[in-house]
C-alpha cells in the first residue's frame, strides 16, 4: 500500500517520500502515513517525533492506536496488488482526531482520486467486517463452487461469466438480484443440491446450509410488500478539498 500511495501522490504533484523502513522518525515531514500491519501501528507511531500529523491506512483500527497525538486515517476500500493500484473513484474511509486532521485525511484521499467517506471509530469493525465479507469471503465462496464443479469434470473458468453477471446484477439491483431455486421456492432442487454437496464435498455442507438459510431470508424479505429493500445513500463524506499541509508527506511501511 505504501508504495502505491507514494507513486500516486508523486503523479499528483505532492512531494512524497518513502516508503521508509524501520527507524524512520518523520523528522522534517508535515504528514506521516503509516502503511504497516495493524498490530504494528502503535509501535510505529511511537517512533515518530512530535510535530508531524500521523495517520494510518487500517480499515479496522481506530485513531486510539496512534496514542495521544493528533491523528488521522485513510483506508482505500480496495485490494492493492504488487502491480500497484488505481485509486480513481474508489471509496475510502477517513477519520480525524479533530477538524483539521479530518480535513487533511479527506484532502489526501481526494488527491489520490479516492472518494472519502467518514467512518467513526465505533463503526470501524463493522465497516471492515463488511468489506471482508464482500471481498475476501467472495473468493472463498467461488472457490467452494469451483471445487464442486470440478467433481463434474469442469474447470472454474465456466463459472466466471455467471459469477461476474451475478455481481454486476447485485451492484445494480441489490437484494432483488437474487435468482435460482431458493428465490423461486423450488425446494426439490434445493434438496437435490444438498444431497450432491453432501456426497461429493461433504465439508461444504455447513456452508451450503448457511447460504440456503440466508438466501431464504433474503428472498422472503424481498417479496414482502413494503419491505423497503433497495439502495441506500453512502455515508456522510468528510470535508472536501484542502491542503495536505505544508512541507512533504511521507509513508512508512515498517515499524
Predicted features by range, described:
Residues 12, 47-51, 111, 151, ...:
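Alpha-helix C-cap/termination motif
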Residues 13-17, 54, 71, 116, ...:
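Hydrophobic anchor at the start of a short beta-strand
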Residues 3-10, 22-85:
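Rossmann-like NAD(P)(H) cofactor-binding subdomain of soluble oxidoreductases
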Residues 5, 85-171, 214:
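Internal alpha-helical scaffold of NAD(P)-dependent oxidoreductase catalytic cores
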Residues 157-255:
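NAD(P)-dependent Rossmann-like dehydrogenase/reductase catalytic/cofactor-binding core
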Residues 60, 67-70, 77-82, 86, ...:
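Predominantly flavin-linked oxidoreductase catalytic cores and closely associated redox partners
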Amino acid at each position: 500500500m505504501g508504495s502505491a500511495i507514494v507513486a500516486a501522490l508523486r503523479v499528483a504533484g505532492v512531494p512524497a517520500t518513502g516508503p521508509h523502513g524501520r527507524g524512520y522518525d518523520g523528522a522534517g515531514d508535515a504528514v506521516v502515513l503509516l502503511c504497516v500491519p495493524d498490530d504494528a501501528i502503535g509501535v510505529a507511531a511511537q517512533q515518530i517525533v512530535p510535530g508531524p500529523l500521523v495517520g494510518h491506512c487500517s480499515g479496522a483500527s481506530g485513531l486510539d492506536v496512534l496514542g495521544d497525538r493528533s491523528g488521522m486515517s485513510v483506508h482505500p476500500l480496495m485490494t492493492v496488488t504488487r502491480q500497484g493500484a488505481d485509486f480513481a473513484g474508489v471509496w475510502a474511509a477517513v477519520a480525524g482526531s479533530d477538524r483539521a486532521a479530518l480535513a487533511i485525511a479527506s484532502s489526501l484521499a481526494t488527491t489520490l482520486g479516492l472518494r472519502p467517506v467518514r467512518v467513526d471509530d465505533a463503526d470501524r469493525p463493522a465497516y471492515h467486517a463488511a468489506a471482508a465479507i464482500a471481498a475476501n469471503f467472495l473468493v472463498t465462496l467461488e472457490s467452494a463452487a469451483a471445487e464442486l464443479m470440478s467433481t463434474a469434470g469442469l474447470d472454474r473458468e465456466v463459472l466466471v461469466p455467471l459469477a461476474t453477471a451475478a455481481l454486476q446484477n447485485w451492484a445494480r439491483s441489490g437484494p432483488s438480484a437474487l435468482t435460482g431455486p431458493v428465490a423461486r421456492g423450488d425446494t426439490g432442487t434445493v434438496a437435490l443440491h444438498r444431497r450432491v454437496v453432501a456426497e461429493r464435498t461433504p465439508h461444504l455442507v455447513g456452508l451450503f446450509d448457511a447460504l440456503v438459510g440466508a438466501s431464504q431470508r433474503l428472498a422472503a424479505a424481498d417479496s414482502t410488500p413494503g419491505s423497503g429493500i433497495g439502495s441506500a445513500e453512502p455515508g456522510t463524506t468528510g470535508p472536501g478539498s484542502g491542503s495536505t499541509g505544508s512541507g512533504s508527506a511521507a509513508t512508512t511501511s515498517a515499524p
